A protein has these predicted regions:
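Boundary-proximal intrinsically disordered activation/regulatory segments immediately upstream
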Residues: 1-62, 148-149
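Short acidic-hydrophobic, aromatic-tinged amphipathic segments that line or gate anion-handling sites
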Residues: 4-7, 75-78, 168-175
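Short, aromatic/basic amphipathic alpha-helical patches
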Residues: 60-71
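Glycine/small-residue-rich loop that forms an oxyanion/phosphate-binding "nest" at active or ligand-binding sites
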Residues: 69-97
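Short beta->alpha connector loops at strand-helix junctions that form conserved
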Residues: 77-78, 119, 145-146, 168, ...
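Structured adenosyl-cofactor binding patch, chiefly the S-adenosyl-L-methionine
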Residues: 98, 133-137, 151, 156-164, ...
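RNA substrate-binding interface of SAM-dependent RNA methyltransferases
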Residues: 103, 108-196
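Active-site/ligand-binding-proximal alpha/beta "capping" segment
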Residues: 190-240, 244
Length: 265
């Protein structure tokens, strides 16, 4: 039999709310929230800690959900409790706690790495989109400074579409030192910058390299830009001065992927 939770004052409900609302709690407990059917099904079993599901979903949903719950167990919650715990307007009926993946710099530097290097990205949706795009474009990993948005913010997690479990990442306290370390390991660092003299499609991304993207409004800091080996730009027509950070990252990563696929032929 599964435990049933019907009280909004239940300690487990209060814990979920703390994890939803406070990055400090997530960091302290090394735990974050996964919400929705697809994200739940995509979460590797090794990371699942606790599952909450409504009775209605458990009764009507597909076999894969039942199989996962059979392996891990769950707690049945009322629709009112699920709505209280949920970060979305229309809860899908399943929410779980997952442990945070942990990586080292060496995990990012496998083979001939293509890395995405992020400085002070603030929008959770942008960060999540960058993770999805990095996975799709074959990036080896993502390095972020501590000023970048919380990866485990519920909105960011949803935006990654589970790429948070598949793309190695590292948050560094000293971004400049990390960039210097990457250069010392032989990586070229291409910075998307308005001062770039060369168009992005003239650069050679076939060797070990990183693509450096700065804050949505302010761009890269002078310190980070100075550590790039190459300043590149994306040419734009009309009166547009800049692109969305996630879009710029996608353009550059896919150009790198195109060149690498062509070089392998």
């Amino acid at each position: 039999m599964y435990e049933e939770i019907s009280s909004l004052a239940n300690p487990r409900v209060r814990r979920v709310l703390q994890l939803q609302q406070k990055a400090r709690t997530r960091k302290k407990e090394n735990c974050f929230i996964i919400e929705g059917i697809r994200l739940f099904l995509d979460t590797p079993d090794d990371f699942l800690e606790e599952i909450f599901i409504t009775a209605d979903l458990l009764e009507r949903e597909e076999a894969r959900i039942r199989e996962k719950i059979t392996r891990h167990g769950c707690r049945i919650v009322t629709p009112e409790v699920m709505k209280k715990m949920s970060d979305t307007m229309t809860p899908q009926g399943v929410l779980c706690l997952a442990s945070m993946p942990r990586y080292s710099m060496e995990d990012l530097l496998t083979g001939c790495p293509l890395l995405l290097l992020l400085e002070n990205i603030q929008d959770p949706g942008n960060l999540g989109t960058m993770f999805r795009t990095a996975e799709a474009a074959g990036a080896a990993g993502i390095l972020m400074n501590k000023g970048t948005a919380d990866l485990f913010n519920p909105k960011t997690v949803r935006s990654t579409m589970s790429a948070v479990f598949r793309v190695p990442f590292l948050v560094t306290e000293d971004f400049s030192a990390a960039l210097t370390q990457l250069r010392g390991r032989g990586l070229r660092i291409f910075a998307a910058h308005l001062a770039g003299q060369d168009n992005y499609d003239r650069a050679d991304y076939t060797g070990p390299c990183g693509i450096l993207i700065g804050n949505e409004g302010r761009g890269l800091t002078e310190e980070a830009a100075a550590l790039a080996t190459d300043l590149i730009r994306i040419p734009m027509h009309g009166r547009i001065e800049s692109l969305n950070a996630a879009m710029a990252a996608g353009i550059l990563m896919y150009e790198a992927d195109r060149q690498r696929r062509q070089a392998d032929r």
